[in-house]
């Protein structure tokens, strides 16, 4: 009986191997860009070690050039774009063809092509247009949205003051502050930083960010077909996403119970519910409960973690480089003084501060591999034929860290974004939010939050580290879909903005 079972297992493995070889042979590799030869079952696992996927792709680009093909597992070919020229040519020059959303295997089972982020085609166009207009009506990009961020920044400063100079990890508070801005837009609610449920939701958002970026997440990207039913890190990620989903469902149910069908939308959930009521008799409508939930869950996750991670990394940089912190505070003192709260209109008066924020985003490269794209139709690109549905990784980190564009890219140097007269200058290679039709939905909100949270904190405090600045590490502890900076302890001390300033 045991022998029969052994032979059955061997036969199954042999058939799987033959199937892998057959499928690999029908992938029309001759029409895709060149790349390392994939192994049966393993794909390019030998060249792409989980936990170091981005660095592995950059290493392969030195051999295969700026456009090449890799296999994540046996059946998932991905075309990789490296450098500004290739990424711009694809995402900008052939924007429609490269406008599809690719796969994030760890989240695929949850979102399943629904919501504004993971949908494609007509569903995506309708949801994106509706979401952008609704958020704009709610104040995003307007004075109301700015006042919302300013109020939350003041709450954050008051909470920082409560630490009374003691070292603390600011990551949770920063995430709660940015999440409150998003929750105000999504649900019309602001939560206390002491609210246990709110803390759990914010931690779940952080756990999701870590889960999709970790070594386990990268392994799952390659072998989800095999790992999905097994225990592993992906099960923990599902728990985090379930926490976000349960919280969102509760908020939606409360809105359904007190929705004013004749009144204006109070928030994005209201706007969705009103639109769903309008489309109730349309059997082909994309304004469904699932699309609403998946849109809101993603915005809650992304809006919580992306901005807070970047603000935290910028604070870490200013502790490591006290002279940069000093120059930022002097500029704030010179231009705003002690009594004027920072506003978005002050950005042009604060060129050095703006340069620091841009350089921090460049150095962090929060999404080094870009969010995966997929081809919406069969496309000719650089002499290759990319079939419809081909996945694409546009490596944004390869642009932000390109030594041919940014000299000594591993160094923190805000002067890259200043001209000879000290005025802020834009850089066409600054693409942390990607480009093309899938450019980040919340780019405007994120920029406003970064500027207002950062300047409000620096106007109120000097930042100190409990350990010597030169011992602080800037290297991401996790690098996958997202770069996650190291945790750190922060000490804040009220600053005297009436002190004498000096010219840089």
Curated annotation (Swiss-Prot):
The residues listed in the UniProt record as binding heme, with positions renumbered to this chain, are: 440
Could you list this entry's UniProt keywords, alphabetically sorted: Endoplasmic reticulum, Fatty acid metabolism, Heme, Iron, Isomerase, Lipid metabolism, Lyase, Membrane, Metal-binding, Microsome, Monooxygenase, Oxidoreductase
Superkingdom of the organism of origin: Eukaryota
Q: What induces it?
A: Up-regulated in skin upon exposure to ultraviolet radiation or treatment with all-trans retinoic acid (substrate-inducible).
Question: Under the GO molecular function aspect, what terms does this record hold?
Answer: 12-hydroxyheptadecatrienoic acid synthase activity; arachidonate epoxygenase activity; heme binding; hydro-lyase activity; hydroperoxy icosatetraenoate dehydratase activity; iron ion binding; monooxygenase activity; oxidoreductase activity, acting on paired donors, with incorporation or reduction of molecular oxygen, reduced flavin or flavoprotein as one donor, and incorporation of one atom of oxygen
Q: Which reaction does it catalyse?
A: all-trans-retinoate + reduced [NADPH--hemoprotein reductase] + O2 = all-trans-5,6-epoxyretinoate + oxidized [NADPH--hemoprotein reductase] + H2O + H(+); all-trans-retinoate + reduced [NADPH--hemoprotein reductase] + O2 = all-trans-4-hydroxyretinoate + oxidized [NADPH--hemoprotein reductase] + H2O + H(+); (5S)-hydroperoxy-(6E,8Z,11Z,14Z)-eicosatetraenoate = 5-oxo-(6E,8Z,11Z,14Z)-eicosatetraenoate + H2O; (12S)-hydroperoxy-(5Z,8Z,10E,14Z)-eicosatetraenoate = 12-oxo-(5Z,8Z,10E,14Z)-eicosatetraenoate + H2O
PROSITE patterns for the chain: CYTOCHROME_P450 (PS00086)
**What is the E.C. number?**
1.14.14.-, 4.2.1.152, 5.3.99.5
**Topology term for the membrane:** Peripheral membrane protein
One GO biological process from the UniProt record? retinoic acid metabolic process
Q: Which cofactor does it need?
A: heme
Which tissues and organs express this gene's product?
Answer: Expressed at higher levels in extrahepatic tissues including trachea, lung, stomach, small intestine, colon, kidney, breast, placenta and spleen. Expressed in peripheral blood leukocytes. Constitutively expressed in skin (at protein level).
Q: Which Pfam families match?
A: p450 (PF00067)
Function comment? A cytochrome P450 monooxygenase involved in the metabolism of retinoids and eicosanoids. In epidermis, may contribute to the oxidative metabolism of all-trans-retinoic acid. For this activity, uses molecular oxygen inserting one oxygen atom into a substrate, and reducing the second into a water molecule, with two electrons provided by NADPH via cytochrome P450 reductase (NADPH--hemoprotein reductase). Additionally, displays peroxidase and isomerase activities toward various oxygenated eicosanoids such as prostaglandin H2 (PGH2) and hydroperoxyeicosatetraenoates (HPETEs).
- Protein family: Belongs to the cytochrome P450 family.
**Protein name, entry field:** Cytochrome P450 2S1
């Amino acid at each position: 009986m045991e022998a029969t079972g052994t032979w059955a297992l061997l036969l199954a493995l042999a058939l799987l191997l033959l199937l892998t070889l057959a499928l690999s042979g029908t992938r029309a590799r001759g029409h895709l860009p060149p790349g390392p030869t994939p192994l049966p079952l393993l794909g390019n696992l030998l060249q792409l070690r989980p936990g170091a996927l981005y660095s592995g792709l950059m290493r392969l680009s030195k051999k295969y050039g700026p456009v090449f093909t890799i296999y994540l597992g046996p059946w998932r070919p991905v075309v990789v774009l490296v450098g500004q020229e290739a990424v711009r040519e694809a995402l900008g020059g052939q924007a429609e063809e490269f406008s599809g959303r690719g796969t994030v295997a760890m989240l695929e089972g949850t979102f399943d092509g629904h919501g504004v982020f993971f949908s494609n085609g007509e569903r995506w166009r309708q949801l994106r247009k509706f979401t952008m207009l609704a958020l704009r009506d709610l104040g995003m990009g307007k004075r109301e949205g700015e006042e919302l961020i300013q109020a939350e920044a003041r709450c954050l400063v008051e909470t920082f003051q409560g630490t009374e100079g003691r070292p603390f990890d600011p990551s949770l508070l920063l995430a709660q502050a940015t999440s409150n801005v998003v929750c105000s837009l999504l649900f019309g609610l602001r939560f206390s930083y002491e609210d246990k449920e709110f803390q759990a939701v914010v931690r779940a958002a952080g756990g999701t960010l870590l889960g999709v970026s970790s070594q386990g997440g990268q392994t799952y990207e390659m072998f989800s077909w095999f790992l999905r039913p097994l225990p592993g890190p992906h099960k923990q990620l599902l728990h985090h996403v379930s926490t976000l989903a349960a919280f969102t469902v509760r908020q939606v149910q409360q809105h359904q119970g007190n929705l004013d069908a004749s009144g204006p939308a109070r928030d994005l959930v209201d706007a969705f519910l009103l639109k769903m009521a309008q489309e109730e008799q349309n059997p082909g409508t994309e304004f469904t409960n699932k699309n609403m939930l998946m849109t809101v869950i993603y915005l809650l996750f992304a809006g919580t973690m992306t901005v807070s991670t970047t603000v935290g990394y910028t604070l870490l940089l200013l502790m490591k480089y006290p002279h940069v912190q000093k120059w930022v505070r002097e500029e704030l003192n010179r231009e705003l003084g002690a009594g004027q709260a920072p506003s978005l209109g002050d950005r042009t008066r604060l060129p050095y501060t703006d340069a620091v924020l841009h350089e921090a985003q460049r150095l962090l490269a929060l999404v080094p591999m870009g969010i995966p794209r997929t081809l919406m139709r069969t496309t000719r690109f650089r002499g290759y034929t990319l079939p419809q549905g081909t996945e694409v990784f546009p490596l944004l980190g390869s642009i932000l860290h390109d030594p041919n564009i940014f000299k000594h890219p591993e160094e923190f140097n805000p002067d890259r974004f200043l001209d000879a007269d000290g005025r802020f200058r834009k850089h066409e290679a600054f693409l942390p939010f990607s480009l093309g039709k899938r450019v980040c939905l919340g780019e405007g909100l994120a920029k406003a939050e970064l500027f207002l949270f950062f300047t409000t904190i620096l106007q109120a405090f000097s930042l100190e580290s409990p350990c010597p600045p030169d011992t602080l590490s800037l290297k991401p502890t996790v690098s996958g879909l997202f770069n996650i900076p190291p945790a750190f302890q922060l000490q804040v001390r009220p600053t005297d903005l009436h002190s004498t300033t000096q010219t840089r």
